């Protein structure tokens, strides 16, 4: 594989970092943390509208989408670079869900009307999301939500959990089982029951109840398994890339603290126990970086990437746990201050650790692939 970043990767990463650096400050994060929304969560937790608008205006949102939907026809490597920067700044925007998964899937598999929706998402005028998780279902490729074809079109019945930005979404991508096979549908959240869920880092996630809910098929039923695999693969990789950025910045923060904080007349970073924990955290971050880079490169080259993607998500969860706790422990009492920026990075890392499956889930999936 080639570890050399593309020029587009560097440019988009730099541009995303500049936009976030101007708009995502510690005060802004605190403001988002303290925001309170309406009864349905319509104007609530952790959505940074000014940042989303700026990312759209600078072309970041559409850059890695196909030209057919208004993008620059870049790809996975460039999307990974953007997600890494967004994770580094704890950006409260749905780039992964609306652009990578929503617009990306519709651009690739959708009909003309659905591709138009992808174009609007790339321009930032609408938000899309995907409902990939279900309670007590550890196999996202085999959803328990069911789809039935009627004279009036498709109808879905089931329940999805932790659906990001469902309250703001124009449409939700919903995988469901239809006649024993998997298919992917578009659902208008106005026709479903959308309920806010309490999340530690105040990410805007919602339960979505479907009861004979009208839906629109994406692609074909026969191609549904391929479409869902495409979505899940990029969801796992995107989450891992975001976690990489979060852990990189968290490690920078704790390294700065260890250099500046003195105890017994010495910087705490000079003590062997602290230095060893920071060294282990550095190794974890580098391991995750290599895993994410390999998975992204394989996908960009249209090579088999399932094992690499599960490996990256395992590292995102396992290394994320260790690094997040190291950052808090080394900061001492400051680390448990909920008003300190370290708390934001800790909760973000813990959220990324378990989102879309934890380390055990992805080890099981990886083991099944290796056993074939």
Regions found by a protein language model. Name each.
Residues 1-93, 368-372:
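Amphipathic, small/basic residue-rich leader segments at the start of a protein or domain
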Residues 2, 13, 333-372:
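Glycine-rich phosphate/cofactor-binding loops in nucleotide/flavin-utilizing enzymes
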Residues 2-8, 12, 88, 192-286:
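Glycine-rich beta->alpha junctions and the first turn(s) of the following alpha-helix
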Residues 24-42, 255, 259-266, 282-315, ...:
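C-terminal helix-coil-helix/basic helical segment that borders enzyme active sites and/or dimer interfaces
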Residues 91-112:
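N-terminal glycine-rich flavin-associated loop
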Residues 124-135:
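A short, Trp-centered hydrophobic/proline-enriched beta-strand micro-motif
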Residues 131, 157-192, 196-197:
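A short core secondary-structure module
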Residues 145-148:
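A structural signal for short hydrophobic beta-strand segments in well-ordered beta-sheet cores
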